């Protein structure tokens, strides 16, 4: 399948501390960016959620409190993430109900 892009598109996915968009926090952000000329780039950031990651959640994605203890917070990463996605269309699975509200 060939994409006919007029601007970049960023496919993104989040791993979190749980599924409550009002309470839970991001622990990992992955972005895969495709440019109209076909070039691609990807980046994954580990994020310190500043709250404990429940063991049942770690069992799903494998990210532990220890793994993110020395990572930047979302606030500290926000400008890097913005720079990667600005001027791009966004795409993700279930993103309208979970990832974007979070």
Predicted segments with their positions:
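Conserved non-catalytic scaffold segment of RNase H-like nuclease domains
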Residues: 1-102
């Amino acid at each position: 399948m060939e994409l006919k892009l007029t601007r970049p598109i960023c496919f993104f996915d989040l791993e979190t501390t749980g599924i409550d968009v009002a309470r839970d926090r991001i622990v990992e952000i992955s972005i895969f960016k495709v440019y109209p000329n076909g070039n691609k780039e990807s980046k994954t950031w580990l994020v310190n959620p500043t709250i404990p990651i429940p063991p049942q959640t770690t069992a799903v994605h494998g990210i532990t409190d220890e793994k993110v203890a020395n990572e930047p917070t979302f606030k500290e990463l926000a400008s890097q993430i913005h720079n990667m996605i600005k001027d791009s269309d966004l795409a993700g699975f279930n993103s309208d109900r979970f990832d974007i509200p979070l």
